[in-house]
A protein has these predicted regions:
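Broad gene-expression machinery/nucleic-acid interaction feature
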Residues: 1, 53, 62-64
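Arg/Lys-rich, positively charged N-terminal/basic patches that mediate binding to nucleic acids
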Residues: 1-28, 107-109
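A general secondary-structure junction signal
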Residues: 8, 44-46, 60, 84
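Active-site micro-motifs of SAM-dependent methyltransferase domains
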Residues: 12, 31, 85-88
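Secondary-structure boundary motif
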Residues: 16-19, 34, 72
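A short, surface-exposed loop/turn module that caps and links secondary-structure elements
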Residues: 31-57
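Enriched for short, Lys/Arg-rich terminal
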Residues: 58-64, 68-109
Length: 109
């Protein structure tokens, strides 16, 4: 089993979800604990560099969980950076902003 860590912004994303979406997210996070490669590797999405991040579809593909693997060579921690709607690239724009704020040009992939 791998450890799941949510950055503070992702905790807020989670708290803002309604009950049925939270249930779907919880199930997917439980699956992720045993398989860090469950998601699809992201690259450049809508001119946002998300290299090194993965996405998982949740709740009928209406929502995404975006995460990365800390130390991909020896995975112990899966770090969730956001949970949100895909519509109008909302979640990807949030993650792009968070990357700039937290990592700047020092993004670890």
């Amino acid at each position: 089993m791998y450890k799941i860590l949510l950055i503070p912004e992702a905790v807020k994303d989670y708290k803002d979800l309604d009950g049925s979406v939270k249930i779907s997210v919880n199930k997917k996070i439980d699956e992720l604990k045993s398989n860090p490669f469950l998601g699809e590797l992201l690259g450049n999405k809508f001119n946002i560099d998300l290299s090194g991040f993965y996405k998982i579809y949740v709740h009928g593909k209406k929502f995404r969980i975006v995460y990365r693997l800390l130390n991909p060579e020896n995975i112990e921690i899966i770090e969730i950076w956001g949970i949100g709607k895909r519509e109008k690239e909302e979640i990807y724009r949030k993650i792009g902003k968070r990357i700039k704020e937290k990592l700047g040009n020092n993004k670890i992939t």
